[in-house]
Amino acid sequence: MNNIVKYLAAVILLSVSLPVSGQTTQISGVVLEDSQSGALPVIGAGVKIKDTSNGSVTDLDGRFSLSAKEGDVLEVSCLGYRGATVTVGKDNYYKIFLEPESMMLDQLVVVGYGSMKKSDLATSITSVNTDDMKIFPAATAAEMLRGRAAGVTVTSASGRPGSTPSIKIRGTRSISASNNPLYIIDGSVASDTEFAMINSDDIESIEILKDAASQAIYGARASDGVILVTTKRGKAGESTVSYNGYVGFQTLHKNFDYYTADEYLSLRREAVANDMGIIDATTVPIATALADDVMAQVYKSGEYVDWENLMFKKAALYHSHEVSVKGGSDKLKAMASVGYFNQDGIMKVNSGYDRISSRVNLDYQVKKWLKLGANTSFGFSKREIENGAFYQFITRSPLSQIYDENGDYIPYINSNKDTNPAYSALHDSHDAKANSYRINAFADIAPFKGFTYRFNVSYYNRVNEEGHSRDSYYPNGGGSTASLLNTTNVQTLIENSIRYDVPIKNENHKLNITAVQSVDKSLRKTLGYSVSNLPVDKTYNYIANGEVTGQQRAYSENNLVSFMVRAQYNLMDKYLFNLAVRRDGSSRFGTDNKWGTFPSVAFAWRASEEGFLKDVSWMNNLKLRASYGIVGNQNGIDNYATLGVAKPMPGEFGDTYYMGYLPGNDLPNQNLKWEQSGTANFGLDFGILDNRIFGTVEYYNTRTTNLLVSRALNASLGYSSMLDNLGETRTHGIDFNATFDIIRSEDLNWSVTTNISQFSGKIIKIDDTVDENGNYVSQPGNNWIIGAPINIYYDYKADGVYQYSDFDVYSDRGSLTYKLKNTVDTDGDGVADAPLSRNDNVELGSVKLRDVNGDGKINEDDRVVYQKDPDATFSLSTNLRWKGFDFFMDWYAVAGGYILNPLMYDGEYGGDLRGRSNGMKVDYWTPYNPSNTAPRPKYGSEVPYMRTLAYQDASYLRLRTIQLGYTLPKKVTSKLKIQNLRFYMTATNLLTFTKVLSYSPEITGNLYPETQQTVFGVNFSF
């Protein structure tokens, strides 16, 4: 499939045929791969007459044809092969051989402020296969990255349309500051929302900077990795129009059983019986069990509400359309694109997403020494928000009355006036809109060979508008209400950079110097109002006509000034050195700590170029790398953390409304300084057996110090907390990726790619406080435990549910008494003489806790760590191509980590049915069903520690993607006057194997389920 994609790309970029002067004739030929595998066709190779725009590309059989005259020089090139030149003679047919590059070692890789050959890299930079990435039909590029690069973890917090997943590069290393990567799009710093808005077909390449040596050139913002995105640009030649679109539908990939009327009645009978001491729950009267006239009437009617069927659609539509135009001349080149994406929510309440995004990239060669360029992007999105409707649905009883006699929803489902979520959704409107644009302009000045100065300026503006309104019919609403919040984010970047390839006569030495100076200013403005008694229901457009009940205003800005210099030295194409240092000054820190210095060093040895390996036929590439660097972190903290900031306090005096101010909650800290991470990275790049097997294995170890942590203060100071530099963490792990080209032939190609990441981390210290033994002290209240991972739950460990076997039974005058068995040896004689001590009443069917430290009692010392982040991730994908057919399959797995499953409990004491107020069917304990999964239900009393049963191993294995495509042969498309035409079908999230009892093994917050998707698409160009 990679060959097909290269062919399609080359067609778009190189298929031009302009007239040339002189006597011309039609020539043809074939381009073949000169390798140990034999003469295989090279698909998508560009064949161009030197110094002209006249060219062609090879088809699926490696063949080409074009007009040329005798004496013309044909330049033949293809990604992954050494170029070749052939002089046109009297012959009309030419057979041209290209020699493969080892692992595509001449492929240019974006490294930040420039690019270089992959073979010359000394740092850890992963190039994402964007062709495979785009196969997954997702709303955002972030979701497409899942499983595409070792060391990169993508997690979905919600399945809601338009939601943006989080990305972590090599795990969590900061306690309070941000752990999100830095995004660079076409050289400009961008946000995750801007990355999410990119049309997938606009992406030319994505590089991920994973070690500190590659990240250090971005200094202050690069501690959590860098994602470099380069978008496509125009090429000289005929204009090419491309379209890629698909239409598909979504369905729930998992369904759960919810209680029927009889099952729910049995549940409530058990709950009442347990509270009232009734042995036989079936004797509890229906009226007593249901305790609600409406519920009793619904039960007698023989009907009940299937909430899952009520809240979910059978299928939800979504579609995507992207159109681009590329072309230009030797002077002016342009690329323009526009895309539209629409996704309907799987829930029947408001939850859709619309996005329009466009891009224009221009390059103008004014003079030989002067080039001007511009990158512009525009985007609009609208997201409908269902306001937690899923949670409301699942916490409602199946014995609910939801319709009136006309079949319309009613506001309350029972006599207790519990609201009807279906009715509430009709009278509640909540949406978020975003408008954004970026204008980036640059000038490249090259006064002499090897030297380029670039002046770059970028302006980004994003306006978010979030509106929420409830009409006068909303249950318990007290009249119509509305709120409107406008947030404006503006970023301005001015950058000067110099890149100089130092001329050295001795070809064994190559030296490149890069220097950068930049000024980055960001500001954020917020304005919001809340009103009541609107003249028009269910709209916030008339918010000015309501009675103001609240307002919000904020303004914040920060500035970053940076200087960077980097030297890259290549000795004999064997020994590679990379030195860099960046100095950043941030307005977020105090006068004495504004500046941070971030150096790095890297070395690589291309062992395969040494004489003792040069003649080893099966060894095509072997490179060893080592690097160390320091990067900074200022993300996730307030712009004014070092200053005393007042907070608004509105008040009234008589009939006059005043806005007053009080001291803020945080004590200002002038000594606040940069959080720093130092990373050592060791890597090995390999390619063997004619590069049929190639990949990378890396080990990294990171130490993060001066953690930006908010610590609690004594209330007598007048402040509740202060941001400070405290503590230290360490993380380490292994990244591995490999590709296996199993079959290479003219008609059949098959390759398999795998990515494996292993990660672990721990907190070394929080502050300098030590106990009597000199050990650093944990802070359990903040879930900061010395020696434990950073991102955790800290809670008791459930051992199931207490069973009959855990008790001794005594009979007193016909009454049975259950006493917990002796399991604790208090006097050390080897005989258990006391039961396990707990601070609550233990009974049959209650939650059983583990005595972790074995001291015979349950207390805070028995709490354990549940790590949220996975221990490892794994992906396996395969590409198979036979003639015009292509097949892709992708598996993804997560090992380790826990989630607190919100479907397994509804809080410790929430709802009238204690501990089990949602309608999802579970196997709860009864005297006749001694389950170990869920405790015995309660009605009016508490079910302590129920949440401990909701910690579940979040490991899963998922068949993530299958795609089948067919590309029409050239002889057909030529008759249709188009360059290429491909049809495809893609299915996602087909199978998931996990122990998590939820709609998704990842989602713990907003309970909007993920979906299974099937799409049918087409792409073509002409």
Regions found by a protein language model. Name each.
Residues 47, 76, 183, 403, ...:
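Short aromatic-centered micro-motifs
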Residues 402-403, 471-481, 652-662, 713-722, ...:
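Solvent-exposed loop segments that connect transmembrane elements
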Residues 242-299, 724, 743-865:
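Conserved small-residue
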Residues 133, 179-180, 289, 319, ...:
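Extracellular/periplasmic, surface-exposed regions of secreted and cell-surface proteins
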Residues 1-359, 364-366, 371-373, 438, ...:
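Short, small/polar-rich motifs associated with maturation and membrane association
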Residues 867-900:
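Glycine-rich, aromatic-lined ligand/substrate-binding cores of catalytic
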Residues 39-41, 53, 82-85, 189, ...:
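Short, solvent-exposed loop/turn motifs
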Residues 586, 841-844, 894-983, 987:
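Extracytoplasmic gating/loop element in the C-terminal half of outer-membrane beta-barrel translocons
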